[in-house]
Amino acid sequence: MASAAFKETDMAGALSPVSSQTTNSSSLKGLSTLSSKVTSVLSTSYADSEFRDALSLLDSRGIQNTAEARRRLRLDLHREVIDSNGEIIDEFGRVADQLRRIGNTLEKLNNSYAEMKTQVTKAHECTSPVLQEASTLIAQKRQVEIKQRLLKSFSGHFLLPEDEVAILTLTSEPVDDRFFNVLAKARRIRKDCEILLGFENQTSGLQIMEQTSRNLDLAFQKLYRWIQREFKTLNLESPQLGSAIRRALRALAERPSLFQNCLDFFAEARENVLSDAFFTALTGTTSGGTVDHSVKPIEMAAHDPLRYVGDMLAWSHSATVSEREALEVLFVSDGDAIAKGIRSGRDTEVWRLVAEDGEEAPEFDPIKALNELVDRNVSGAARLLRQRVEQVIQTNEETILAYKLANLLGFYRVMFAKLLTEESILVECIRNLEAEALRQFRSLMRDYIANLQGEFQHVPPTLEPPDFLVPSLQQLDAIMKTYETSLTASGDREADFQPILAEALDPFIAGCRNIGKALAPPKDSVFLINCLMAIKRVLMPFDFAKGRVEELGEEIGRESSKLSESQYLFFREASGLAEVFDAVQSLTDKPEDVERVRTLAPLAPAALVHASQRLDDFLPSALLDALENIKYLQDSTMARKITEEAAEKFCLNFEHVEYILMYADESAGQTPQAERSSEDDYGGPQLLRTLFPRTTEEIRVLLS
């Protein structure tokens, strides 16, 4: 680098022989100066940032490392500093000139401001009285305008003009939007009069309230008469309440008595219309005797009693739904407004306050009011429906039809309860009809059972279900299929069906049990199982009979146990081992029990030989003979299972006998392999297993 080279050269020059020769003639002071310079150069740290910056500056200036450059370096640097200072002084001179010009401008502005301030002060002194007078006049004008607006607002808010009073009270004026607007204004005036009554001077408030109340009374009377006329001309075949009459009813709700009178009038008219329509649907003729050829009479089209009742109920349901849809626009959409009007209207009817003294007034429920009105509208048709259905129920002599009628009525009872309420007249009517149909069903069932009392004494020779049970189960199956498709309001269908089973099934089960009591075992159990299995097969497909199916299964299990015990007794007696089983039943492998074996008569050699021979005669046909005992059991799988259980129990007892005989032989010092001499002729201790050679495995094979 240039700076490094410059320094190295400078240092080399300072130490060269030539330099030394030049300074030989110098004084001792010159030598000291040179020495200090060399020491200073050598002590300079190249890590010093300022030193590095100085070297970088020399590099950037492009100075050549010559003797001339080294001599002029300091002079050039001083000249550059002087030139820079001169430029700065020139710039400050120009700044001073600009500041002098700004000072002159500010002086001129101050002079102009002082002159303007003087002129404004003079003008203010001249106009001040005029402005004060003008302010006073403006304030007075503002007060007059406020009083004018207040008077106008008071008159417009608390007073009805003559034309609006005429619209509100005169019957010659129509009930239209203008009427309702004026009515709303009059109601607002009466409410706002309460504010006037709060002042010390109540005269104006009392007068305005009295006049407004009188106009409102006349308006509600006019509205009441108008609604009555509209109801008379309303299309009652399709009672869609228009927006005008709905609005009128909402307004009339502030007079609960008048509102209720209108609803009563409407309900009475609809009751008559629906009664006539139902009669026409039944007979094809109107109540006046006119034939309506557009109607297909239900009485002529429905020859089946069930369809006849179903068509009548379907017509009633359709009419009820139509009534509700037509009226719910008023009670659901406008229910809140009606409820609010009735609440405010109770305070205006003094006689209601007296009648309800000390009692909390009932809250208006739109849905409840709708249900009550619809129920009243169809009450006439409900009475006619009750008469016709009662006639069908009382003339019916078929058990299944009686239940189907009750089930159909129960279905519609649930439907109407969802549509109206449980307390409605129509639902109560159908509930009574359903109860009457069930009474008729129970009566017919009892008559049917009474007619079968003679058949309850006869048992089929094949122990199959008696003749009376088969049609009875077919009848029960039809009843259960009907109930399965029914709509019930209760969540526990099984509990609801128990009374039906008590009437349609329990008497027949009791009859089968009574018949079985006259039979000897095992026929009684076979007969009862056949009957119970037939009943169980009918009940199993239905979920709501699971409890009864389980009860039947338990009873069948008990009877099966009896049959199994009977088959076991047959194996004991027919095999000739009954006495042997009884003899060893209480014996164990204890020495004292084993010693008693040869003292027991059934286990004597001659008795064992006889028992063994009889067992051999029994075993080849034992299983077939046992199955023959219960051959009339219709469930062959159950018969085989019962016989197998009895055979297993027989084998277990036989195995116990086998073990006891083996223990007896061992206690006598003999082994099962010892052979008895043919010359003994039972004279000495005999090998019991030789006398009784059959094994348990052989018995299991022969009885399996």
UniProtKB/Swiss-Prot annotation:
Bilayer-crossing regions: none
InterPro entries noted in UniProt: COG6, COG6_C, COG6_N
Location in the cell: Golgi apparatus membrane
Keywords: Golgi apparatus, Membrane, Protein transport, Transport
Membrane topology label: Peripheral membrane protein
Source superkingdom: Eukaryota
Keyword Protein transport appears in the UniProt entry: yes
Keyword set includes Membrane: yes
Pfam families documented for this protein: COG6_C, COG6_N
A GO term from the CC aspect: Golgi membrane
UniProt record, GO biological process: intra-Golgi vesicle-mediated transport; protein transport
Family assignment from sequence similarity: Belongs to the COG6 family.
Function: Acts as a component of the peripheral membrane COG complex that is involved in intra-Golgi protein trafficking. COG is located at the cis-Golgi, and regulates tethering of retrograde intra-Golgi vesicles and possibly a number of other membrane trafficking events.
The name this protein goes by in its record: Conserved oligomeric Golgi complex subunit 6
Species name: Pyricularia oryzae (strain 70-15 / ATCC MYA-4617 / FGSC 8958) (Rice blast fungus)
This protein's encoding gene: COG6
